[in-house]
Amino acid sequence: MEKCEGIVIRQTSYRESDKIVRMYTREFGKIGVVARGAKKTKSRLAAVTQLFTNGYFTFFGGNGLGTLQQGEVIETFSSIQQDIFMTAYATYVCELLDKATEERQPNPYLYELTFQILRDIDEGYDPQILTQIYEMKMLPVLGLYPTMDKCAICGETTGHFDFSTSSNGIICHRCFEKDRYRMHLPENVVKLLRLFFIFQLDRLGNIDVKQETKDWLQKAIDTYYDEYSGLYLKSRKFIREMDKWENMLKKDSDD
């Protein structure tokens, strides 16, 4: 019998009334368990196995899937559950975590980061910015280490910088001619990318960013992920389509 604190990051139906639940836990990293009878509304496991739920779990372990015995809800993130936009971003966070990690490789920092991101989304902070911070923080988990504290080519720490996927990081104006395909980013966008990658989430505070800046950030992050991560995430595609519709609606209302 094992006990842990975890977040439900994925659930799938299994047989008539059971679920297979994927959790990211503080103690064990990512684990999978069978929750017997959890699809029944009166089941004692129904609430604690809902997507995004943070709770205490007791389970029988094994080489494959464990068997969930009981759970206690700590936090349900109810605002996320009730808002389609919050749900979309939270789903992407969980899918990225699922695809980027292996079974039973504990990473308490990553657990805490994921909890903080979901909590802040639930509390109404900008989900797009929070997700972009999470994407940058997940790069080392994927084995990706872009040079963000100095020029990736010459090592200079001062000057104007652009972002270069081919050089795996930022490059200074002295080296611009060495990469004519670099991304020409506004200075504040480069600064934010560096902050997102280097600083802890609690040091960043509540960041108020214009939509144009968020669009630049997303373009840079998406380009880097497409080049290096090897991941295809359905939830990311859905968010991008959702953002397009939201921007179109805003434009129509402004007109």
Swiss-Prot record:
HAMAP family given in the database record: RecO (MF_00201)
Sorted keywords for this record are:
DNA damage, DNA recombination, DNA repair
Query: Biological process GO annotation list?
Result: DNA recombination; double-strand break repair
The record's section on Pfam families has: RecO_C (PF02565), RecO_N (PF11967)
Task: Quote the function comment for this protein.
Answer: Involved in DNA repair and RecF pathway recombination.
Q: What does the sequence similarity comment in the record state about its family?
A: Belongs to the RecO family.
Q: Does the keyword DNA repair apply?
A: yes
What's the protein name? DNA repair protein RecO
Record-linked InterPro entries: ARFGAP/RecO, DNA_rep/recomb_RecO_N, NA-bd_OB-fold, RecO, RecO_C
Output the NCBIfam families linked to this UniProt entry. Answer: reco (TIGR00613)
Q: Which SUPFAM superfamilies match?
A: ArfGap/RecO-like zinc finger, Nucleic acid-binding proteins
Under the heading PANTHER family, the entry gives: DNA REPAIR PROTEIN RECO
Protein's organism: Listeria monocytogenes serovar 1/2a (strain ATCC BAA-679 / EGD-e)
GO CC, any one term: bacterial nucleoid
